[in-house]
A protein has these predicted regions:
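Active-site core of glycosidic bond-cleaving carbohydrate-active enzymes
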Residues: 65, 70, 88, 367-400, ...
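Catalytic cores of secreted or luminal carbohydrate-active enzymes
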Residues: 120-152, 704-745
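Acidic/His metal-coordination segments adjacent to aromatic residues that form catalytic metal sites
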Residues: 350-364, 415-433, 488-505, 603, ...
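Bacterial N-terminal signal peptides that target proteins for export
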Residues: 1-8
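Acidic/histidine-rich catalytic neighborhood
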Residues: 467, 471-525
Length: 747
């Protein structure tokens, strides 16, 4: 009897312990620390970043930027800020008006667009290229050990402490140990480093001239006569530098501890030579001349620690440590690395560039259609304040957006595609005609409002939401033959179906319905009447087009849309690769090509999901967006499986196609498909040690993939409005005990 009683007590205690563990708060410190990146060799794709979201410093295996030439074609060693921009002198006096062209389109016979003039006239084409390339993001300066060789560096042991925002690097230089700790001030554009070594290595500070190229590390080292570096203040442990790069002027403050000598070794080169084995230094970058000395090393380090501790303690988090599926630890690692990457490079006052603050692509300018992937996740991970910082920039861009709509004959404001802090539209033969960025402002505003609802917030952004929707309402055309509203005269989101031939692109149709619905809801919250015209559009907006076998098409019409008559049956669960994708290995092929049999090519050549360049926009219509009258559940189920089976994952995908598929599958309660979508082993979504997505030799970093992952995984955990399933994106097979805190559901 006593034995049975004892056994009962033990079992009860165990049950209570399990219950207590289930309710115990996530150990956030342990979660972050077990996923810290670790580097043991010099590899141009293994660089790591410290940053505060508005300024970032990317370092090589030495903890500084010692080998920029070696890393040039990998994750290059950049020092970038949100304010650092440069324009080449406009010697030909190009005018914006020279980039504009009357471009009649179906449904919109009168419209003036900013284009590139590929067929001339030559001056217009050159004007368009000048405005595309200017302004471009400026590399502020390279900071690295002076005159070291890659071959001299051995025994590398480097760890990024993401909890503190500290990069710890240890290596041997000619058999002498060197230890470096690197950090970035949490509030200011200051990089700090402490160095411990009997080698007493000097630090070189070099300033490049910009290249103006669309995609590179923005460093030209052979144009010293085009810019200048002047020491305007020199004190025993501090110096102030004025940088003049054409019309761009900025300032650099260098401060250090102990005995060291700062010397100018070239027109745009400095060297800081220490006398002590242990010392530290700080390099701060300023848009305007600083009037007080910058913080010292200790203060900068504490600022970095505070910034990152506060972030990790208040952000949403997901803990996969209780899962037994072998994919769980890999997925957790990718999530945590993405959180760090985006907070360190994309917590800006402007929309981010596609490669963040790592290196320049598209001249360092930002693409407004990508804001959805870069930044929407903040509102779902308990960081709506970071999303609102970017929303505030949109308010400054309203006048430019209103001018665009007016010259094209539309009401309201039309958001540009590619731009910079000035909000000037970059001319483009594609970007000027896309529209899927248009409802983003409405969605952003709604996500922030849901996170912290208030009448004050509604009033602040109501006019921008209203005017954004006004353009949307004026852009649709009424098709009297079929008593419906249609979208035409726009380039589809995939940029494969052009503005001349595309009719009713799937994602844009669903997004128009969602955006106008939310805009009406905002009017009601403010005590205003609904727009009758908008309600009519909502009631008569054309449903998504389908193939004869009931698969949603990317668009109803468009040049290049395949014939679906011989579609592949969609009954079985798709066979997709599922395995480790975090291997840190350099891709073997640069072109992403795949080998298919002739039979496979023949079978798939007419399938829309196997057309390189398409972007799964029919899946975006239900995943990123909630259910609407435009969506039929049965057809979307078939579309999901068809996409999962036949998408050209090895040659036609972007890093955000995977979360697109995952979100669609999650809403359709297909968790295994959702999970496979974000864990498949595919080189175009290769995860580097830093957490960056390697997509191609041009896009060695692609941060929309990281933001998309966070969007998808948050939905897989927290679901959406009206979802009653716990962790709806994870299989209920006992292997996925996913715990999370601080996440918010999708609409």
């Amino acid at each position: 009897m006593m034995r049975n009683k004892t056994f009962f007590i033990v079992v009860l205690a165990a049950m209570l312990l399990v219950t207590a563990c289930a309710d115990t708060a996530i150990d956030r410190h342990a979660l972050v620390m077990r996923n810290n990146p670790h580097v043991t060799k010099i590899d141009s794709l293994h660089s790591l970043t410290v940053g505060n979201g508005r300024f970032a410093f990317t370092a090589d295996a030495t903890g500084l930027q010692t080998f920029p030439e070696y890393y040039k074609e990998g994750l290059s060693l950049g020092t970038y800020s949100e304010w650092g921009w440069h324009s080449f002198p406009n010697k030909e006096d190009y005018k914006i008006v020279e980039t504009l062209q009357d471009h009649p389109l179906p449904g919109h016979p009168h419209g003036i667009y900013a284009v590139q003039f590929p067929e001339g006239p030559e001056r217009n084409a050159k004007a368009a290229e000048w405005f595309r390339a200017n302004p471009h993001r400026l590399h502020l300066g390279n900071i690295g050990f002076d005159s070291l060789l890659v071959s001299d560096i051995t025994k590398i042991d480097q760890t990024l402490d993401m909890w503190k925002g500290e990069l710890h690097s240890h290596f041997l230089w000619r058999k002498l140990p060197v230890t470096v700790t690197t950090s970035c001030n949490g509030d200011s554009d200051i990089v700090s480093a402490s160095v411990s070594s009997s080698a007493k290595l000097a630090v070189g500070i070099r300033f490049p001239y910009p290249t103006g190229e669309a995609a590179d590390d923005a460093t030209c080292w052979t144009a010293d006569d085009c810019h200048s570096t002047d020491i305007i203040l020199s004190e025993p442990q501090r110096a102030l530098i004025r940088r003049t790069v054409d019309s761009t002027v900025y300032y650099v403050e260098i401060s250090w501890s102990g005995k060291a000598v700062l010397s100018q070794t070239g027109k745009n080169r400095l060297k800081l030579t220490p006398s002590d084995k242990q010392w530290n230094f700080n390099v701060g970058f300023y848009k305007h001349q600083p009037v007080v000395p910058q913080p010292d090393y200790k203060a900068n380090l504490l600022s970095a620690n505070r910034c990152w501790r506060d972030y990790w303690q208040t952000s949403g988090v997901i803990d996969f440590s209780s899962c037994t599926d072998p994919r769980a630890s890999l997925l957790e690692r990718r999530v945590v690395l993405s959180q760090y990457l985006l907070r360190s490079q994309e917590a800006q006052n402007y929309p981010p560039a596609e490669t963040g603050l790592t290196y320049n692509t598209w001249y360092g300018k930002f693409h407004l259609e990508m804001v959805m992937w870069h930044s929407f996740h903040y509102a779902l991970w308990n960081k709506a304040d970071l999303l609102e910082k970017q929303l505030k920039w949109y308010k400054t861009a309203v006048p430019m957006a209103r001018d665009i709509a007016a010259r094209q004959g539309f009401n309201g404001i039309r958001w540009m595609k590619m731009t910079d802090p000035s909000s000037k539209e970059a001319p483009s033969d594609v970007g000027s005609f896309i529209i899927w960025q248009q409802p983003h402002v409405i969605y952003m505003s709604e996500l922030i409002y849901r996170a912290r609802p208030s009448q004050e917030f509604l009033r602040e952004y109501a006019d921008m939401v209203e005017q954004t929707a006004a353009f949307m309402a004026s852009f649709v055309n009424y098709d009297s033959d079929n008593d419906r509203y249609i979208i035409q005269g726009a380039c589809a989101a995939n940029e494969s179906y052009n503005e001349e031939t595309t009719l009713n692109p799937a994602f844009e149709m669903a997004y128009w319905h969602f955006g106008l619905s939310i805009a009406q809801k905002w009017r009601e919250r403010l005590g205003l009447q609904r727009h009758a015209e908008w309600d009519e559009i909502l009631a008569k907006l054309a449903p998504l087009a389908t193939s004869p076998d009931g698969i949603y098409l990317p668009a109803e019409k468009g040049r290049g849309i395949p014939d679906f008559v011989n579609g592949i049956p969609a009954e079985k669960l798709p066979e997709m690769p599922a395995g480790g994708y975090i291997n840190g290995q350099r891709p073997k092929e640069a072109d992403g090509s795949v080998s298919l049999s002739e039979g496979e090519k023949s079978k798939r050549k007419h399938d829309p999901f196997y057309v390189t360049g398409t972007s799964s926009e029919n899946l975006l219509a239900y995943g990123m967006l909630p259910e609407s009258r435009l969506i039929d559940q049965e057809k979307m189920q078939k579309t999901l499986v068809r996409a999962a089976q036949n998408w050209n994952w090895s040659g036609g995908s972007w890093s955000w196609n995977y979360p697109t598929l995952a979100m669609n599958a999650t809403r359709l309660l297909q968790p295994e498909i959702a999970l496979r979508a974000i864990t498949m082993d595919n080189r175009e979504d290769l995860l580097l040690p830093s957490g960056n997505n390697y997509r191609s030799t041009r896009l060695r970093s692609y941060l929309p993939g990281n933001g998309g992952l966070l969007l998808a995984v948050s939905m897989m955990c927290a679901g959406w409005d009206g979802c009653s399933v716990s962790n709806p994106g994870f299989p209920k097979d006992g292997k996925w005990n996913v715990r999370w805190e601080g996440l918010h559901p999708m609409p």
